[in-house]
Design a protein with these regions (language model features):
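Conserved N-terminal segment of class I S-adenosyl-L-methionine
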Residues: 1-87, 103-107, 112, 123, ...
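A short beta-strand submotif of the Rossmann-like class I SAM-dependent methyltransferase core
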Residues: 87-93
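A short His-aromatic
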Residues: 96-97, 101
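Short glycine-centered segments of the SAM/dcSAM-binding site in methyltransferase folds
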Residues: 115-118
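Short "lid" loop at the C-terminus of a central beta-strand within the Rossmann-like core
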Residues: 122-128
Length: 187
């Protein structure tokens, strides 16, 4: 088993309040806009935590569709759905993934995405520490790093929004031409 995932499984098991899914709400308006703009019908929340954003807070009602859920550290959601999905989003997840595992992670995300990807990434150390004592944010980098990683390791071009927050607040859109081409085909 992956050492990092094992650490997160232990962390999730410690308290019901550890990573419940509360990082979706601050990003929800961006994702709702993407769902509407692309007319997305199928979604994947990549790194959903315990999923309370759907079971308790009902954020899927704002999205207009219930997404598939994936989180390798939560037994109920540890199997990655095959897809494809119109949209894939991940909020406060990428910074928890070691740099050496990012190529595989981006492959998993971008190979399944058809219309859009939204990534919200924190750029400062976490408050949380893992059972090992390490900071939960092992990859704290500015937006330029993330754009380079996406461009280098995505198996295909996908309309992508990247938002960073924390010590480096930024927002960029990649492959906007993909959306514009799709949009023009609608008329």
């Amino acid at each position: 088993m992956n050492w990092w995932i094992d650490q997160y499984k232990q962390y999730h098991a410690e308290l019901n309040t550890n990573y419940p899914g509360n990082n979706l709400k601050p990003q929800l308006h961006h994702i709702v806009d993407l769902v509407k703009d692309t007319k997305a019908k199928t979604l994947l929340d990549f790194g959903c935590g315990k999923g309370l954003q759907y079971t308790k807070w009902k954020h899927h009602e704002e999205l207009g569709v219930m997404p598939e859920l994936y989180d390798p550290a939560v037994p109920e959601y540890e199997k990655l759905p095959d897809g494809p999905f119109d949209g894939i989003y991940s909020t406060d997840v990428m910074e928890h993934i070691p740099k050496e595992q990012l190529p595989e992670t981006f492959y998993k995300i971008f190979s399944r995405a058809e219309k859009f990807v939204f990534l919200a990434i924190c750029t400062k150390p976490a408050i949380a520490t893992l059972p090992s004592g390490e900071n939960a944010h092992c990859t704290v980098e500015p937006i330029g790093f993330w754009v380079t990683m996406i461009e280098r390791y995505s198996p295909k071009r996908v309309y992508t929004h990247v938002k960073t927050y924390g010590n480096c607040n930024n927002y960029t859109i990649l492959n906007e031409d993909m959306y514009l081409e799709w949009y023009l085909e609608q008329f």
